Amino acid sequence: MSGQICGIDEAGRGCLAGPLCVAGCMLAREIAGLADSKKLSEKRREELYAQITKNSRYKIVEISSAQVDEIGLSACLRSALEQILAYFMGFSRQIIYDGNATFGVRGLQTLVKADAQIAEVSAASILAKVTRDRTMYELAQRYPQYGFAQNKGYGSRAHIAAIERYGLTPFHRASYKIKSLQPSLFD
């Protein structure tokens, strides 16, 4: 652990409903068990989330589905990255974003699979995922028919079937096109 690295990752990029969450994290001390959030159980992510928030400087940016629809995913990512970069300015010597695109934001280094290699990026991955999952559990209480507690807003068969039956909620990304719901050339 360097103490000079800020890791950034996001959750909810390809979902049909719910926010895009982008987190930046600079660890104050080493935390055992950090890994890519997708490789951890929900229980373990929650445990690590508590440790990370107590032992780091962090920022989480939550972007609504409406904003994604209005300005697009890339512009939303750019905005979130700029906010995180501004927050960590002067605290971090190196800012590493998981992926291969900077979305036009200067001062970022990108690294594919950084969430599996760099503790600070793993921590950011966990912060983003837990924040987003908690929002989806709240939405599941309001819209139980969509199965948000299980699918977290991603395009599962059951979720797509619910959209076909009930339509979109205000938390769905209306700009995202679902192939199976598009009219066929032969209809």
Regions found by a protein language model. Name each.
Residues 1-187:
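RNase H-like, Mg2+-dependent phosphodiesterase core
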